[in-house]
Amino acid sequence: MNVKVRKFPYPFKCALSISSDIDNASSLDSFVQFMDFLNSENQTIYGPGLGLEVGNSFWFFNGSQSFQLSYFEGLTNKETLLAPIIRTYLQSKHIDTLHSWGNFDKGGFKRSYANKGMEVLNKYNFNVPVWVNHGINLNYQKIGDYPNMYGDDQNHSC
């Protein structure tokens, strides 16, 4: 008998993974509507929902000059209206990506921001399995072996 393990469960021959990204989400309402469109079959402003299982990302802080949805208001510890929604999506696993600790397009990242983010994750017992690591060069919290990536350098001030 010749038994083999298939790459994909029968009857499937391939797979596709889709992840949305909070970058430039225009408003709290549009973010929620888009998540509903992707993950339900409800009628949405985008049309009937697709009924998929699509994850998304979030930031704890917004240190950029542009409007960005985040857990905290700007660089403060004050929760936004999105914070409880983020917690709901983290609990349901519809948010599975930490878009680094925040958008720091103006620079200014400090380890205290990461500590505050960890406080929230620990308080609610959330595990975020994916880390998004992109951003302009002033986002020093990025991790890697390229210039301006200091997130894993314990000797750097960020």
Question: Where do the protein language model's features map onto the residues?
Answer:
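Catalytic alpha-helical scaffold of carbohydrate-active enzymes acting on polysaccharides/glycoconjugates
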Residues: 1-158
